[in-house]
From Swiss-Prot:
PANTHER family assigned: ARGININOSUCCINATE LYASE (PTHR43814:SF1)
Protein's recorded name: Argininosuccinate lyase
Main location: cytoplasm
Entry-linked InterPro entries: Arg_succ_lyase_C, Argininosuccinate_lyase, Fumarase/histidase_N, Fumarate_lyase_CS, Fumarate_lyase_fam, Fumarate_lyase_N, L-Aspartase-like
Lineage: Bacteria, Pseudomonadati, Pseudomonadota, Gammaproteobacteria, Enterobacterales
Length: 457
């Protein structure tokens, strides 16, 4: 059943109908559409369009429909209705007859769909926040269990300075905390109701829109009807949040893919999140992580696509806006799935401490410590940097780590070097000296774990 047609003398071409209809994806807004309709029925009582008895009949029927939808949402797709609004109204009329035709009084699908989508986004943000915090907690637990796992830190994918696996985990906790903050900030701007703005100029009925917003769980009502029905900033913001969040998850995945490789061998992933090869029986592939990394692109694409859709639209509503739903549904579903999968990857991961330690002792990751040692002896840093570079070349020539060079060898480059240099070059000393806030010292890492646990409690 179309909600329009009196103006037309010909039926829509079936090809146009298939092109135009949105039920195949906006059926996901069924619950929100029903909840919004219940609130609207209450508002119509306040302006005398419905009696209290009529409103009760409508609300009872809508609540029955809500339970039917929750029990079997796929039933909606068996209909040839144009969109979810048409489907809900048609089902309501089936249940209460002509009374159902009064519900749309003073309401447009423009403010209706804007309201439905905001309600859906609010619920989805709450799910994302929960999944985000669960992943943060999993990272903190993994960090706590691996505070003593020393490994090389990298810049340019070359060994740079020693860190710990715990410190690595906590880096991603920081990223996820920013993702959490962005979602919470987006929720503030999302939490305003457009219902009652009509097609574009507002409703002709003196409805208390603030009261209506409260019934729907919004903190307030929007202030401009033109903007309200054409605003999709919340979609862009959520897609941006998702795009940034997926970049973080993609980097997390890439790190672990490398750590799990035969070349690094720092971790072993659980059999539960890996797969094999149809040809090579020895393979154990990090498919969960590769899919997280791969799915990042589709989320970036959804953001770019939505920006291009909106950039040239005049006020107010245009059918182009129907393109908002598939992208945001898919992007937020993808982000949510990847948050859950990342947490599952951490459940059962094994950190190979000895392999990590061996790698940290290679690659001259303690070279900066030698430079700092020279600075403490009064050598200007730029000169110390050059001296250590020459010492590294000598160590490479001899096939030794820096700490294995003899004192005589080291003193070829600077006579200020003495026996007290050797304790400075140990991995533990490298870690202990990074004791400023945010550093990799055991004390700082322990404090960071305690802080994160308290924040997430």
């Amino acid at each position: 059943m179309a909600l329009w047609g009196g103006r037309f003398t010909q039926a829509a071409d079936q090809r146009f109908k298939q092109f135009n209809d949105s039920l195949r994806f906006d059926y996901r807004l069924a619950e929100q559409d029903i909840v919004g309709s219940v609130a609207w029925s209450k508002a119509l009582v306040t302006v005398g369009v419905l009696t209290a008895d009529e409103q009760r009949q409508l609300e009872d029927a809508l609540n029955v429909l809500l339970e039917e939808v929750r029990a079997n949402p796929q039933q909606i797709l068996q209909s040839d209705a144009e969109d979810i609004h048409s489907w809900v109204e048609g089902k309501l009329i089936d249940k209460v007859g002509q009374l159902g035709k009064k519900l749309h009084t003073g309401r447009s699908r423009n403010d209706q769909v804007a309201t439905d989508l905001k309600l859906w986004c609010k619920e989805t943000v709450r799910e994302l926040l929960t999944a985000n915090r669960q992943l943060q907690s999993a990272l903190v637990e993994t960090a706590q269990a691996n505070q003593d796992a020393v490994m090389p830190g990298y810049t340019h994918l070359q060994r740079a300075q020693p860190v710990t696996f715990a410190h690595w985990c906590l880096a991603y906790v920081e990223m996820l905390a920013r993702d959490e903050s962005r979602l919470q900030d987006t929720l503030k701007r999302l939490d305003v109701s457009p219902l009652g703005c009509g097609a574009l100029a507002g409703t002709a009925y003196e409805i208390d829109r603030e009261q209506l917003a409260g019934w729907l769980g919004f903190t307030s009502a929007t202030r401009n009807s033109l903007d309200s029905v054409s605003d999709r900033d919340h979609v862009l913001e959520l897609l941006s949040d998702a795009a940034i969040g997926m970049v973080h998850l993609s980097r997390f995945a890439e790190d672990l893919i490398f750590f799990n490789s035969g070349e690094a061998g720092f971790v072993e992933l659980s059999d539960r999140v890996t797969s094999g090869s149809s040809l090579m029986p020895q393979k154990k592939n990090p498919d969960a992580l590769e899919l997280i990394r791969g799915k990042c692109g589709r989320v970036q694409g959804a953001l770019t696509g939505m920006m291009m859709t909106l950039k040239g639209l005049p006020l107010a509503y245009n059918k182009d806006m129907q393109e908002d739903k598939e992208g945001v549904f898919d992007a937020l579903d993808t982000w949510l799935d990847c948050l859950h999968m990342a947490a599952l990857v951490l459940d059962g991961i094994q950190v190979k401490r000895s392999r990590c330690q061996d790698a940290a002792q290679q690659g001259y990751a303690n070279a900066t410590e030698l430079a700092d040692y020279l600075v403490a002896k009064g050598v200007p840093f730029r000169e110390a940097h050059h001296i250590v570079g020459e010492a590294v070349v000598e160590a490479i020539r001899q096939g030794k780590p820096l700490e294995a060079l003899s004192l005589a060898d080291l003193q070829k480059f600077s006579l200020v070097i003495s026996e007290d240099v050797y304790p400075i070059l140990s991995l533990q000393s490298c870690l202990d000296k990074r004791a400023a806030k945010g550093g990799v010292s055991p004390q700082q890492v322990a404090q960071a774990i305690d802080y994160a646990k308290a924040r997430l409690a």
